[in-house]
Structures are given as structure tokens and as C-alpha cells.
């Protein structure tokens, strides 16, 4: 393991895969990825009611970090979102590890040959900070996790149409600016009897 690999270990990995980072640790790690590579940029797409930035990472091999430049590049645009329900943190930790591997391992950089990635590690930033060990008691880890709804007690995953939440209003503006070709929304089950560790569903 190289010195850079050690430097870029995620909070989740350092904890022995038992703990997920809080908001401050997550944003700090996002900025570390930005500083460690020219192909990842940290920005935000809005601010939550409690004043937290809504973090966004952009990964592009040719530093196309605007909607206009991505469109001109001809790349497919992939939007990956995690922690719309902050108790379901697997997507956040996996996404940060994926971007880390892309910038630190040459064999992964080919993933960006024809694709630009937008990654939202935490959508519901305020609910994310209501950390507790009993928020999803039937779920297999992490030791503590965030709360399902926002500071205004809104479920963002039920707000795409009515857009009551300031977070969703910011998300819709961001989505319409970027117009991604493919959208992955990461969730975690809290005890349902799925036959596989990872599953996916496609809306058609």
C-alpha cells in the first residue's frame, strides 16, 4: 500500500468498515480528493435549511467541470446520489472509495474514458447529522447513522414532484443544469429478505 493510498483511506475503511463519517468528515474527504487529483473537483449545488452545503463531486478525465463542457465533450453523464435517506449510508462510502480508486489506480481511470461522473455523497445533509445507533435497528451497520427526514421533517424521496424542501429545489435546479444521461440513487434495506447483498432496479 503506497503512502498516497494510506492518505486516501476513507473514514469507513479506517474504522474497519464499522463507522460511516459525519458531514464534516465527508466534506473534508471530498476536498482531499479534489486536492489529490486534477480530475476530481469539489463544489456544491445549494445550502440546507440548517446552513450546510449540499456537496457535489465532479470526475472528468479532461477536467470538464461544467455542464457546457461535458456536453461538448460527448461524454455520457452519470449522476450518482447517496444519503437521500442518511440512515442508508452504503452508497456514500462506496462512492467515495470508487472515486479514490479512480484517481489513485490507473486501471480504474479508463472508467472515465467516455463518462463524466457527478457524485452527491450526502443529499439530506441535515438529517445526516442526527446520528444515532438506533435509527435503523434492523440494518447491518454502520454503528451509527443519520435520520431519514430533513430538519423540516420532510422525506426527500417523496419530494421530487412537489419540491417543498429547499434541498429538493436546489437538486432540481442542479439536475436541469446538468441533465444527466443516467441516474443512480443509492439505498440500503433495513432487514428485508433480499437474496443478494447488492440489487438494482431500473425504471423504464
Where do the model's predicted regions map?
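Well-ordered alpha-helical segments embedded in enzymatic catalytic cores
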Residues: 25, 29, 167-170
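Short, contiguous pre-domain boundary segments
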Residues: 7-13
Amino acid at each position: 500500500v503506497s503512502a498516497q493510498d494510506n492518505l486516501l483511506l476513507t473514514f469507513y475503511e479506517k474504522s474497519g468498515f464499522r463507522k460511516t463519517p459525519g458531514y464534516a468528515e465527508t466534506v473534508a474527504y471530498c476536498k482531499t480528493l479534489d486536492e489529490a487529483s486534477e480530475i476530481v473537483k469539489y463544489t456544491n449545488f445549494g445550502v440546507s435549511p440548517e446552513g450546510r452545503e449540499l456537496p457535489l463531486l465532479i470526475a472528468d478525465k479532461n477536467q470538464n467541470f461544467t455542464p457546457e463542457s461535458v456536453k461538448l465533450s460527448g461524454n455520457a453523464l452519470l449522476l450518482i446520489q447517496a444519503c437521500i435517506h442518511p440512515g442508508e449510508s452504503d452508497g456514500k462510502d462506496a462512492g467515495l472509495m470508487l472515486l479514490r480508486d479512480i484517481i489513485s489506480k490507473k486501471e480504474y481511470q479508463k472508467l472515465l474514458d467516455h463518462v463524466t461522473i457527478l457524485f452527491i455523497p450526502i443529499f439530506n445533509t441535515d438529517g445526516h447529522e442526527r446520528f444515532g445507533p438506533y435509527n435503523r435497528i434492523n440494518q447491518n451497520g454502520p454503528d451509527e447513522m443519520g435520520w431519514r427526514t430533513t430538519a423540516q421533517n420532510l422525506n426527500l424521496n417523496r419530494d421530487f414532484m412537489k419540491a417543498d424542501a429547499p434541498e429538493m429545489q436546489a437538486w432540481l435546479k442542479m439536475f436541469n443544469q446538468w441533465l444527466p444521461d443516467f441516474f443512480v440513487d443509492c439505498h440500503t434495506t433495513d432487514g428485508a429478505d433480499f437474496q443478494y447483498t447488492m440489487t438494482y432496479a431500473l425504471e423504464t
